[in-house]
A protein has these predicted regions:
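N-terminal cofactor/phosphate-binding cores enriched in small/glycine residues
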Residues: 19-78, 84
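Structured secondary-structure scaffolds
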Residues: 1-48, 100-104, 157-210
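The substrate-binding groove and active-site-proximal loops of carbohydrate-active enzymes
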Residues: 15-21, 59-68, 89-100, 181
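Cys/His-rich short segments
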Residues: 115-172
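Short, polar/flexible loop-turn hinges at active-site or ligand-entry regions and domain interfaces
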Residues: 64-70, 115-121, 135, 178-182
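A broadly conserved sequence feature marking short terminus-proximal activation segments
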Residues: 71-127
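Short low-complexity, flexible loop/linker segments enriched in glycine and/or proline
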Residues: 59-63, 107-108, 135-138
């Protein structure tokens, strides 16, 4: 009898610094689910990895006098060693600087652009470099990032956007038809009430100046 496929992934660890307890907590939980599904007879593919792009990485590398690639090589190695030390059973460890990953991203990006789902526009917002987060004026606390309290800077540039608004109705219907699609319930409510019902916004998918 052919096994039913089951794909599971962690979020990919950001490589601006050493792995932390949140990374290990997540990989252990995901590993437990993967092992449970294998025991149930599923053909499990368990993926994890590292996110190796961002302004914070560039700044950390500059502080150490090395290239961003050399910096993320060291952090990615530490992340993988940590996951291996915990005997997690992942099948594939992806790095966003891997040549294969870059080629696949470019292929998907071109396909989406050709079919009109990605377009060029202008992105403008208030950006916190340490948190790598954008905020609106109303979200700031005394003019600073609400998470870390540091100053933010205005950022405006040409960027590419994914036409997410095009799929709002389809997403809402899928969630209504498959109530278990987003779990736990609190996260489903957050997605529906905070994003879909107010009007799903197009997503910026590129950066050029930061």
């Amino acid at each position: 009898m052919e096994k039913k496929p089951y794909y599971i992934t962690t979020a990919i660890a950001y490589t601006s610094g050493k792995p932390h307890i949140g990374n290990t907590y997540e990989i252990v939980l995901t590993d437990a689910i993967a092992r449970y599904r294998r025991a149930q007879g599923y053909d499990v593919f368990f993926q994890t990895g590292t996110d190796e792009h961002g302004q914070k990485i560039e700044e950390k590398a500059k502080e150490q006098g090395i290239t961003p690639k050399a910096f993320v090589d060291g952090v990615a190695s530490t992340v993988r060693e940590t996951f291996d030390m915990m005997n997690t059973s992942y099948d594939y460890f992806i790095r966003t600087t891997d040549e294969g990953h870059e080629k696949q991203v470019q292929k998907i990006f071109r396909k989406l652009y050709e079919q009109g789902d990605i377009y060029k526009g202008t992105y403008e917002g208030l950006y916190c470099t340490p948190c790598e987060s954008f905020w609106t004026e109303s979200q700031l606390v005394d003019g600073c990032c609400p998470d870390c309290g540091r100053p933010v800077k205005k950022a405006k540039e040409e960027a590419y956007f994914f036409r997410m608004s095009k799929y709002a109705d389809r997403l809402m219907k899928h969630i209504e038809d498959h109530p278990e699609f987003i779990q736990p319930e609190s996260r489903k409510n957050e997605m529906v009430n905070n994003f879909l019902k107010p009007g799903l916004q197009d997503l910026c998918v590129s950066r050029t100046s930061f």
